[in-house]
């Protein structure tokens, strides 16, 4: 396939996806066109490192330097293309209208769906100063014919993939995936053309949902102590209790701001059974002490301790010296920790611990690095779910929230996305129940996020969603 043939093939597919050319070479032929087509595929361009073709913003000129995002392909040869680099590029004039788009995490997530072992992505798509060094190193090592052109544009390629044309059909399919993603970003086309874009993107392999229970059980086997973290509604406590069904004995404790060492481990409390007028105290066995005693007395049993909302308490005050017992590999350490009448180097081998942590509650205690090292951390993500016959999962509403978080949430803010439990309602009254849940549970939650300074760029999208689905204004 020649470079010109590759260009024409990609252009034809772009028109199927809704591209309407505004120009033909330097002449404007359709002022309402949604893209400017650039093409430099003559022989000298392959010598001086300037061979490419691109679909750029319709607001740019047919020639000269340009701004903003573009779909670009750099072929390696004029007469026989052996490989090419397909890119989301930025014009050498930088950003003019696309900076806001570049700043949204959703754009990078959109293109990351195209990831292969030959694709390269900058951490920030706003960055047009640093070099795409991994791409450049790969080109220098294995694709010398493309070295000059990639060297010329090495700072303005936020997303790229090296495509080999050894298998022409496979190569074109990969290129069309990138083209469809760019078309989706630019919102090209009629309803029918958007369906063509969607059909192309549906060919992408879908990530498999993790088997949370299986993965957590594996962690318990290897690490013993696991924290389940996630946003409200992701099923942290439910999952812990589900896993608990496989244990012989389960102990459960929910932490709160006033939880202390004597509550969790061991202490004293007033003895109210005495008739004497003199105040007397008796031993107060905390749940950890009781768990240890039981484990020592029942060495053949599997014991699980569940600590719900572990970061609601001041962990230094709650754990004290027993902090050192939560060590899944004690090594040669022989220091004993005293817990009332017990002296331990570590927790008994038949005890495992699951703690839960709400990542959305920003008022909670910070978990220090020493505790993080002692526990394995497993994140429960929101996901679609199958429910019983009398209930229904409100997939449409769930996806509307998921789309907003995908588009606007930073990596940290993704931990705030409401979980699937919010979207499970009774089948008999599903619409009314979902509306009430949005008004009285989800709207206050989102307003709290916004008040704390999170997801501010998504504010208008949330306002529109709540107004559309409930008829209620988020802000009067």
Model-based region annotation:
Residues 1-17, 132-200:
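Long, solvent-exposed, polar/charged low-complexity segments
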Residues 2-44:
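Acidic-basic catalytic patches of nuclease active cores, encompassing PD-(D/E)XK
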Residues 20, 46-51, 91-94:
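A short, conserved, highly charged catalytic patch centered on acidic carboxylates
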Residues 32-76:
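Amphipathic, interaction-prone secondary-structure segments
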Residues 51, 67-70, 84, 224-226, ...:
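Residue-level detector of short, conserved catalytic/binding motifs and their immediate flanks
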Residues 68-74, 83-87, 421:
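Histidine-centered divalent-metal-coordination microenvironment in nucleic-acid enzymes
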Residues 78-141:
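Compact, glycine/acidic-enriched structural inserts
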Residues 184-476:
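C-terminal regulatory/interaction module of P-loop NTP-utilizing enzymes
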């Amino acid at each position: 396939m020649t470079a010109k043939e590759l260009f024409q093939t990609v252009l034809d597919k772009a028109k199927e996806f809704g591209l309407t050319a505004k120009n033909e070479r330097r002449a404007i032929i359709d002022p309402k066109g949604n893209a400017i087509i650039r093409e430099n595929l003559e022989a000298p361009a392959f010598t001086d490192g300037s061979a490419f073709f691109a679909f750029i913003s319709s607001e740019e000129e047919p020639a000269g330097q340009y701004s903003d995002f573009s779909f670009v392909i750099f072929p390696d040869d004029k007469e026989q293309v052996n490989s090419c680099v397909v890119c989301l590029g930025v014009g050498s004039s930088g950003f003019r209208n696309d900076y806001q788009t570049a700043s949204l995490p959703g754009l990078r997530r959109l293109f990351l769906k195209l990831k292969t072992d030959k694709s390269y992505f900058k951490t920030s798509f706003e960055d047009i100063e640093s070099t795409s060094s991994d791409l450049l190193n790969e080109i220098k090592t294995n694709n010398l014919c493309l070295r000059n052109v990639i060297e010329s544009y090495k700072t303005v390629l936020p997303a790229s993939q090296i495509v080999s044309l050894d298998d022409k059909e496979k190569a074109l399919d990969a290129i069309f995936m990138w083209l469809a993603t760019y078309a989706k970003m630019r919102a090209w086309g009629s309803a029918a053309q958007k369906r063509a874009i969607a059909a192309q993107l549906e060919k992408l392999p879908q990530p498999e949902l993790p088997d949370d229970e299986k993965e957590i059980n594996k962690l318990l086997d290897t690490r013993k102590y696991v924290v389940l973290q996630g946003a409200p509604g992701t099923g942290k406590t439910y999952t812990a209790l589900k896993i608990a069904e496989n244990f012989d004995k389960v102990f459960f404790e929910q932490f709160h701001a006033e939880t202390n060492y004597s509550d969790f481990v061991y202490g004293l409390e007033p003895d109210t059974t005495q008739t004497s007028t003199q105040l007397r105290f008796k031993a107060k066995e905390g749940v950890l002490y009781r768990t240890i005693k039981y484990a020592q007395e029942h060495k053949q049993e599997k014991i699980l301790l569940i600590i719900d909302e572990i970061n609601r308490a001041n962990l230094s005050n709650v754990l004290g010296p027993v902090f050192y017992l939560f060590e899944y590999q004690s090594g040669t350490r022989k220091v004993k920790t005293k817990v009332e009448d017990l002296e331990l180097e570590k927790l008994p081998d038949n005890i495992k611990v699951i703690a839960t942590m709400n990542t959305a509650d920003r008022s909670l205690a910070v978990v220090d690095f020493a505790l993080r090292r002692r526990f394995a951390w497993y994140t429960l993500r929101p996901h679609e779910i199958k429910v019983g016959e009398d209930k229904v999962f409100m997939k449409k509403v769930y996806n509307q929230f998921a789309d907003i978080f995908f588009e606007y949430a930073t990596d940290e803010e993704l931990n705030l996305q409401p979980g699937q439990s919010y979207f499970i309602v009774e089948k008999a009254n599903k619409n009314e129940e979902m509306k009430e849940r949005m008004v009285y549970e989800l709207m206050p939650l989102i307003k709290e996020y916004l008040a704390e300074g999170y997801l501010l760029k998504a504010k208008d999208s949330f306002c529109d969603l709540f107004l559309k689905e409930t008829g209620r204004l988020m802000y009067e």
